[in-house]
Design a protein with these regions (language model features):
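Alpha-helical packing segments of well-folded alpha/beta enzyme cores
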Residues: 3-4, 24, 102, 122, ...
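Extended glycan-interaction surfaces of carbohydrate-active proteins
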Residues: 10-97, 121-135
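Carbohydrate-binding/catalytic loop surfaces
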Residues: 39-52, 105-107, 113-114, 140-152, ...
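Short alpha-helical patches at coil-to-helix transitions and adjacent helical residues
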Residues: 57-61, 100-103, 150-154
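Long, well-ordered mid-to-C-terminal structural blocks that present hydrophobic/aromatic surfaces
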Residues: 89, 93-119
Length: 194
């Protein structure tokens, strides 16, 4: 809701809806940590986190923008790192596991947290196991046609190289030590900066 409120204010649209959205936002619960200090996947007490699940929607605030509620709270940042690492423990046992897009979600989160080796592991798994010889991407290793990583893979590389938001450009925020040299040009950042 914060994003739609901000976008509406910037664009001068939906002014009558902003108070409704602000009221809804005020009633929403804050992020929560589970008993292991990981950010909770589910808010309901009776629902336990499922670290084997292919999605990581509880880390949404780290995908394409960095939620200030997370980024300014050391406990939440640590909780997100723990959640990513817990899911990675399971994926490392299976060299990535299933569902490429779930790995993209974890990798985006790792980039936001500066976890370069975790992001690099996922980039490597995705590059080695989720493409057929004809360069068609797959949902699972080498099977089930799926286009998710066609956009996710290059986006992951970019997130490892640069992060931007209004008023901030961060170069090499998640560069793994394996990338010792190189260059890139023509990168389009938020705000039309190239």
């Amino acid at each position: 809701l914060r994003s739609v409120i901000e976008a509406s204010q910037v664009l001068g649209v939906n002014q009558d809806k902003i108070p409704v959205w602000e009221s809804m936002q005020a009633k929403m619960p804050s992020y929560m940590l589970n008993e292991n200090g990981e950010i909770r996947e589910w808010m309901w007490k009776d629902l336990q986190d499922n670290h084997k699940h292919r999605h990581a929607s509880h880390l949404f605030g780290l995908y394409d923008f960095h939620d200030p509620l997370i980024m300014k709270d050391k406990d939440l940042l640590e909780g997100c790192k723990r959640a990513v690492n817990r899911r990675m423990e399971i994926r490392r046992q299976d060299n990535g596991g299933i569902m490429a897009f779930g790995m993209i979600q974890l990798a985006f989160s790792a980039c936001a947290l500066g976890e370069s080796e975790t992001a690099y592991d996922m980039l490597t798994w995705l590059g080695n196991s989720y493409w057929n010889n004809n360069m068609v991407s797959t949902h699972d290793p080498k099977k089930t046609f799926n286009l998710d990583i066609c956009g996710g893979y290059p986006s992951l590389v970019m997130k490892m190289l640069v992060y931007s938001e209004p008023g901030l450009i961060s170069l090499l925020p998640c560069k793994p030590q394996q990338w010792r040299s190189g260059h890139i040009n023509g990168v389009a950042l938020r705000g039309g900066i190239i």
